[in-house]
Each structure stands twice: as C-alpha cells, then as structure tokens.
Amino acid sequence: MQEQYNPQDIEHKVQQHWDNNKTFVVSEDPNKEKFYCLSMFPYPSGRLHMGHVRNYTIGDVVSRFQRLQGKNVLQPIGWDAFGLPAENAAVKNNTAPAPWTYENIEYMKNQLKLLGFGYDWNREFATCRPEYYRWEQEFFTKLFAKGLVYKKTSSVNWCPNDQTVLANEQVEDGCCWRCDTPVEQKEIPQWFIKITAYAQELLDDLDNLDGWPEMVKTMQRNWIGRSEGVELKFAVKGENTDLEVYTTRPDTLMGVTYVGIAAGHPLATKAAANNPALAAFIDECKNTKVAEAEIATMEKKGMATGLTAIHPLNGREVPIYIANFVLMDYGTGAVMAVPAHDQRDFEFATKYGLDIIPVIKPADGSELDVSEAAYTEKGVLFASGEFDGLDFQAAFNAIAAKLEAEGKGKKTVNFRLRDWGVSRQRYWGAPIPMVTTEDGQVHPVPADQLPVILPEDVVMDGVTSPIKADKEWAKTTFNGEPALRETDTFDTFMESSWYYARYCSPQADDILDPEKANYWLPVDQYIGGIEHACMHLLYSRFFHKLLRDAGYVKSDEPFKKLLCQGMVLADAFYYTNDKGGKEWVSPTEVKVERDGKGRIVSAVDATGRQVEHSGMIKMSKSKNNGIDPQEMVDKYGADTVRLFMMFASPADMTLEWQESGVEGANRFLRRVWKLVREHTELGQAPALDASALNADQKALRRDVHKTIAKVTDDVARRQTFNTAIAAIMELMNKLTKAPMTEAQDRAILDEALKAITLMLYPITPHICFEMWVALGQSNIDTASWPTYDEAALVEDEKLIVLQVNGKLRGKLTVAADATQQQVEALGMQDENVQKFIDGLTVRKVIYVPGKLLNIVAN
C-alpha cells in the first residue's frame, strides 16, 4: 500500500479493472437469485449535477450490497434523450438537437464512469434512437387496434404571432416566452391513450405496493380520485336537450339554485350565438388556461346565459351560468350548484345575488348558520320533502333510487384521472406512427414500415417544428394511396414509461423478450425524486399493465420497492442590481463569516461586494448555487463524494451541501487507509482464537460483530445508510484506541478491518478494492458480505442499574447468567444501597431481568 491515500491513482486503476473485466455485465442465471436495481435515468442536459450524484450513489450502494449477498444484480443506465430543452439549446447554439444531445451523452457518460458506478454498459441506450422508439411506435399501433388509443380535440396554448403551440413552461405570465404575445387557447385534434380503462386496477394495486412510501401512494390515490356519486339530468327549458351533471352529494339536491357550465360547453356556444357580451366572456375564459389546482384560489367569475334548467325532482326553474371554475376537461363540463353547502358555490352566489337555500342541518342539533359561509359537513336533510330527516347515506340511496326510477339519473363511480394525452406539437420526440389518407381515414403505419424515423439533420428556427415545416416529410402512401403522416410527436413520458423493461433485453427484435423480461422484472429497487409521483410513476404502472395484457410480462407492477431521495440544498447568495432584481452569486465565489453557532453573519463575493444569504435552498442553475460534482471528484476523489452523499443525511431527506462535511468524509477515509496500512505492514495477522480472548478483547470483538449486525440491518431493511456509516465510524474510533500488544489484539483488528472494508465497499468501492488486496484477499467484487457471529454477541456480564424507591443509587456488574436471587443479594450488599435503606423496611423488590433492580422501602 502507498503510504498516503491517493484517490486519483486508485480510482483510475480500479475503474480500468472493472472495464477490462466487464465486472458488472450480467446475464440471466436461473440458479441465482436476481436483483434488479434502477435509478431514474438522466436527461442528457450536458453535465451531471449533485442531485444526479445522490440518486446514482444510492442506487450503486444498494446494487453492490446485493452483489455481496450473492445475488445476480442488474444495474443498467441509459438516457431519457427527447424533450424541449434540446430544442431550446439547439436554437441558442445554432445547431440541431441531435448532435447537442449525443455530445452531452458522451460527456455525462464519462462523468458517471469517474464516479465508479457499477453499471452494465452493454445495456445502455438513448431513447432518441430509432432502435428504441421503433418498438414504442409498434406498441402504440397495437393499442390502437385494441381500441385503447383514440383522437379527439383538446385545448393547447397557442401563440398567434408565431402560429405555434407552446408547452406550459413556455407561457410566462400568460404570454409567449419568445415574442411576448398574449397566449390563446386553441382546440386541436390530439392522440390519447385510455388510462381510464385501468383506473380501478391502478387504484386497487397500490394496496400491494408495500415497498413504496405511503406519501407517494396517497398522491396517486388522490390523482386517480375515485368517487361514488350520482349522474343526473337537468332538462333545459325550451330546448330539446338535457344538462348532465355528476355529484358526490345528491343529499344536497333540493338546495340547487343554479347550474354552472364550462365556457367550452356546447350549450354555452349556443347561448352566445346572439349575445356578443356572452361570446366575449367565453373567449376570456377560454384564453385563461386554468390548472385544476388553481381553481380554489382564483377569482370566481360568471355570466348568465339566459337559459333555465329544470330541477329533476321538484321542477324548480334555476338559471344556467357560464362559470370560469367549471372545466370542460373534468366530468361533464356542468355542475349543479348548492351555495348553502359548497363554499365555491356560496362565493359565486353571493357575488351574483343568487338564492342560497339550506337543506342540510347538523346531526347534533346545533344551530345552522349559512350567512357567512357554506355548511359543508354531512348532516340531516330538511326542507327536502319526502327525504326530510334522512342522514347522508340514506338520502344518497333514496334520492339516487328516485332519480333512477324516473329515468333522470343513476348511481355511478367517477374518476378524477383523465386519459393520457400523448400528442406534442414539438420536433424533438418520437413521431406518432399514424397516417391520414385522402378520404380522411386515419390508419396506423404497418409494422414492416416502422420505425417512422425522425430526421436528425434539421435547421431549428425556434418557432415551427422542422417536420411540420417540411411538407415533403409528411407525404407518404398507405396501401398504395397517397397519405399524410402525423407530424405531432409523442409526449416524452412515453419513452420513460417502459425503459425499465427494455433494459432486460435491449437487443430484442420486439419491444421485449418475454423470457428475459420475466427473469428480471419487476424492478426490485427503484430510486428517484418524489416529484415524479403522479406522472412518470403512474404512467409506468399503466404501461406495465399494458405489457402484461399484451403477453410480454407476467407481473402486475413494475417496481417492488421505491426510494424517493431528498433534494440537495446549498447556500445561495445574491445582491440587488440597479433594476431591483436579484443577481445570484455562486457560493464558490463567496467568503463568509459565521457566529459561534455556525450561522452566516457576513458574506462578500470575489469583488468584495456584500451579498445577501438567501438560506439553504435547492441547488439550481437559476439560483447559481449548484456545486459541480466534477470539481469535487477532482479535489477529493469519487469515494469521498460518495461517502459524504450517503452520510450527510437520511437518503429520503434533504441533504445540505457543506464542503466542511466533504473534508470530514475525506479525513475519515484517510484514517481507515492509515490503520489498514499500519496493520498490514506488520505482516500477516495471527489466527483468531475466540476461546483465548480476555475480557477486553471479547468486548472489542463484540463491538465488531454488533456493528456488522447493525450495518446489515440499516442497509438491507431500514435503508438508513447514514446510521450504518456512523456505526462504522464509531467502531473505527474504538479500534484506533484499542491496545495492540498481544497476538489476539492483531487477530481481532484483522477481522475488524476486513469487515469494515466489506461494509464500506458499496459506498466507497475504489479504496476498499485496494485495501482488500492489502489485507491479503483476492477480488472484493466477488466477495461476500460479512456475517456476524452470534457467539461473539453473547455477553459474559450484564450491567444492572440499582434503584431505591425509583431513584438511581448505583450500578452493578453481574455474570450474564446470574439468577434473580443472586442479583438481589449483591444489590442489597451495595454500599450506596445500604446507605439509602438504612432504618427502612424493604416492602418489595422489582427486578427487570438483565437490566434493573428497584428496592421499594419505607
């Protein structure tokens, strides 16, 4: 071993060894238990950031730990390579998205290798390559044949100046990010996949995901949003049509005082035909795109249509209003409004002077007051005719039954979940494999004509998609007839919804090789951010069920266990510029002064200017507080960066980046290196003889095996990697202080250092690879995780706490197998106990075996 720990030399050498020996390349082995560990694959943005490093370090620790358990471990990597940022970067750098993407992949691949992640690089792919998306295109045509794909008009953000569709993130304060033109809402035909056909199964199967965080499952349950209610019809006076509404509160039906409809509802269009003011209001609503989440807080606006709805049970006439809080995309685009029992309806009714009729009162008989706010609790019906006195459930059933008997409604189950719109009016995505013939018929592209290849040699003007601008690209034939290609591309969530499955057989001449897929799937451990809870994780679950129903996989779910890593935070600093805006300064350019408690009291940048400390916030480009992993690896080595990432915080909590912590991790590795070097320089250690150990040696060996037991549980079951590292550090402190005068002292140290090297290997594999060889072993990559010796954990002695009347009066060391009588006798003889019971009568003695003796006396 070199005298000094030199991470750069070691890491380069060990990484060469892994590459040359294809250490992490795996294949199916029916004789070995498999373990598939996957971290969410990166978008090739150009450089890795610390969030990536944290995610991939956790994945590598889990993978290497499972390898040491003797399992056949698959840990693949690839690139989520389509998407809008590549288009933006291409315009900015005057290039095309493809070369920009491929350059980034090469650079980031090198960065991943420098961090020592044990990937099977033979399985690497980029989703922007035709050999990947070709199978996605074919699967889409199969879903179309099954009736699970359809086309309908849907609203998009439209820039009238550029004549182009904008993604939500390209709309800034209601205007186009490029030309500042007010954005409009435009209805265009788009492709959808029927995820709603699987809504109930997606909901039910969450109960089987024991290895998922409860929070993610709750988020998905809410997103799917199953509710039981009643679908009912309001006739429209003077019109030969009905308004269909869905309600989860049919018990409030007798309190309806108006009906709200969406601006996009056909009835709204009809009412506005001869009403310019109404038409203008509809345009205003349509051009204010509202996310469902914003409805609760936005100002409620409406306008009367002049139309009247007829109550289905009591025949009361109620006005029909267009309301900006009713969305066409949700439910039927119409709602029955009960201002007395719904706060949103109450605010609207108060604003427009509409009736507020209470029909539910508290079940406990307390006074009902709807003068200031709606009463939204469930209670007992009144002013509801034949339904008076019924509670919620009884009223629900009775009103539903009456509506059904009269052909005006029925009980139904509703889902908040909407079908998945997969059309994007962008260039850098997989072309949707559909064509339209001259007779207007839409057809899937036949399998023998796939893939529909996205041309990569294009010029980006920053406005129109090159495949929309190039009229020749769309021209094709179908069965010998002229046809036009679909020029929309797939939502990039399509690629990320099945990539985990493609890794099982990346060269397969089909979307999957079922035999290989069923060996590896489901993924045993998936790692990624909680921000993907409702989109990517739900779409992947859906896609897996589609693959199952197409006969490719046997499992119902793609991911057994899910770990959502916390964000990486760093100090952020700024100064205020002449225009009053914030200019963010990189923490690497800031000198800080701290008080006695470590709080920042003063900060100046490289020019000497005072800067404000904004606190510890998520690392991001916009706040200029990202720390480049490359710089840290160059300065301290990959093992140090990995160790800090795993030690600084529990994996699922936020991690505060502190370079002092990185320095601490580096010092610890140097201490381990030094102890191993000093130990190995003395030559081979004598054999361990457990029967020849004295009490101190037994205690130290017990600590070694307690640590093995704790670290094993922390890593395998609890996934509290930080406490596992803390336990190893504690053991290191004890070993450093332990005497090394006898042969058995060295034997215990040898056993301990081998265990520490194996336990640190998943976290800091390069240094452990070297130390393992120095300790006289062969290849740590194929070694086994240490097991603790039950016999070593057995204690010869126990420490008993002595109490008199519940107060601590002393401690007593007894043989581990001492009886209660022996402990009582020794306890009574204790000098301090004698002092406190002198002159008193012992009433009883309470003994907690092996822990405590309490003498009750008065």
UniProtKB/Swiss-Prot annotation:
InterPro entries given in the database record: aa-tRNA-synth_I_CS, aa-tRNA-synth_Ia, Leu-tRNA-ligase, Leu_tRNA-synth_edit, M/V/L/I-tRNA-synth_anticd-bd, Methionyl/Leucyl_tRNA_Synth, Rossmann-like_a/b/a_fold, tRNAsynth_Ia_anticodon-bd
Compartments where located: Cytoplasm
Superkingdom, taxonomy of origin: Bacteria
Family matches, as Pfam families: Anticodon_1, tRNA-synt_1, tRNA-synt_1_2, tRNA-synt_1g
PROSITE patterns: AA_TRNA_LIGASE_I (PS00178)
Motif ('HIGH' region): 42-52
Gene Ontology CC annotations of this record: cytosol
Biological process according to GO: leucyl-tRNA aminoacylation
Motif mapping: 'KMSKS' region: 618-622
Keyword terms of this UniProt record: Aminoacyl-tRNA synthetase, ATP-binding, Cytoplasm, Ligase, Nucleotide-binding, Protein biosynthesis
E.C. designation(s): 6.1.1.4
Enzymatic reactions: tRNA(Leu) + L-leucine + ATP = L-leucyl-tRNA(Leu) + AMP + diphosphate
A single GO molecular function term of this UniProt record: aminoacyl-tRNA deacylase activity
Positions contributing to ATP binding: 621
Predominant subcellular localization, coarse grouping: cytoplasm
Entry similarity comment: Belongs to the class-I aminoacyl-tRNA synthetase family.
Record's protein name: Leucine--tRNA ligase
Source organism: Vibrio cholerae serotype O1 (strain ATCC 39315 / El Tor Inaba N16961)
The gene coding this protein: leuS
